[in-house]
């Protein structure tokens, strides 16, 4: 889902609309709303649901979704699109919950791991076996199995099925296939927005990994935009004037971890200041 998000933003000159502008954040918010609408409608366990992955990432489809975005005026009502290969299906009703960790590791040989792991709620199910807490990840299924017409929801509970996840561990390679950066975050369904924020911050806005991780979190899923405390008040007021429904002053639960390699081979690590993470080397 994070890649659909970025694919829409690729249609705009994000480098000219930085984090100090209302236009930059308006573009970010609208791409978020559109990507979440598609994700909530189409995504489920691919062993049970035909997820149109290629269609969701199709360049023409992303361009058509991006055409819905006007940074001067919020989209009145966001709905899912119809990507190539998509089947008609009911609207989903899943409430995702946070309780996750993320780390990025790079060794002396240049091998990189970006890993997100979860037990769902704090301490998972509350039951420990062999020194490990068992997760309660099944709560990531939709609590409603069918819509009013009796159609099975994409994320409904079924035997042997995996619940939908927002985990987005990311590794970015340059045009030559060489490592450039790795990032990711915990945070329930907000993971998608957190990961996208770190990528846009570094790749489009030219921020350091530390500054990209520390950027105020902005999560837009549906009609309400949740903006973290510390966000520029003038930009927030301008976004409201453009029709966005803003819930300001809300603390967010990101835990972004980043490793980036510069052109001279220097490695830079960064950890989200909101959690107990650090950048370290042997």
Regions found by a protein language model. Name each.
Residues 7-10, 185-207:
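Alpha-helical support elements that line or immediately flank enzyme active sites
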Residues 11-118, 127-129, 250:
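Internal maturation/activation junctions in enzymes
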Residues 74-76, 80-81, 88, 98, ...:
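Cofactor-centric catalytic regions
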Residues 80-91, 147-157, 241:
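Short Pro/Gly-enriched beta-strand edge/turn motifs at strand-loop
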Residues 109, 160-163, 195, 204-251:
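Extended C-terminal subregions enriched in glycine
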Residues 111-175, 181, 205, 209:
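Active-site rim segments in enzyme catalytic domains, especially the processed small/beta chain
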Residues 120-122, 187-188, 223:
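A short acidic/small-residue loop/turn micro-motif
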